[in-house]
């Protein structure tokens, strides 16, 4: 992203292509599902690059998505779970931070302690907050 911002044409093309690809996927899923309750951006870029979130959603206003631009551009993972769509948006858009490393560690500890049966019901520490 830094190289794209400083004018590297190949990096700019890569960012353009990725945003376009994600927009196509979101549109395809919306058509296939017939109704979308929410869109979630997560992981490194999804958590920390408001410009990318905005570019991915550009052109999807036909689905009734309205982004609070100031909140979107100001939101980073350190802010925790954040609703970045406006109250008028037909589809809620969230930025939700992840911590894959914590999940991996807790899975291993659960397996070693023989307390891990199913990841869908395992009591991760972050669920107890």
Where do the language-model regions lie?
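Adenine-nucleotide phosphate-binding core of ATP-dependent small-molecule kinases
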Residues: 1-32
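Active-site proximal loops enriched in glycine and acidic residues that flank catalytic Cys/His/Asp
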Residues: 4, 15, 40-45, 71, ...
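Short, glycine-/Ser/Thr-/acidic-enriched flexible segments
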Residues: 7, 46-47, 100, 110
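Flexible, glycine/charged-enriched surface loops at secondary-structure junctions
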Residues: 12, 29-37, 66-74
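Conserved phosphate-binding/catalytic loops in two-lobed NTP-binding clefts
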Residues: 54-100
């Amino acid at each position: 992203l830094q190289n794209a911002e400083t004018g590297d044409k190949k990096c700019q093309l890569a960012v353009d292509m990725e945003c376009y690809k994600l927009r196509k996927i979101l549109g395809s899923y919306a058509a296939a599902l017939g109704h979308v309750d929410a869109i979630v951006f997560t992981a490194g870029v999804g958590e920390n690059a408001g410009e990318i979130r905005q570019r991915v959603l550009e052109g999807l206003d036909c689905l009734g998505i309205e982004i609070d631009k100031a909140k979107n551009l100001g939101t980073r993972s350190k802010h925790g779970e954040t609703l970045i769509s406006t109250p008028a948006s037909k589809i809620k858009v969230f930025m939700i931070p992840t911590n894959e490393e914590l999940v991996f560690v807790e899975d291993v500890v659960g397996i070693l302690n023989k307390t891990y049966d199913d990841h869908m019901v395992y009591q991760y520490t972050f669920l107890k907050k």
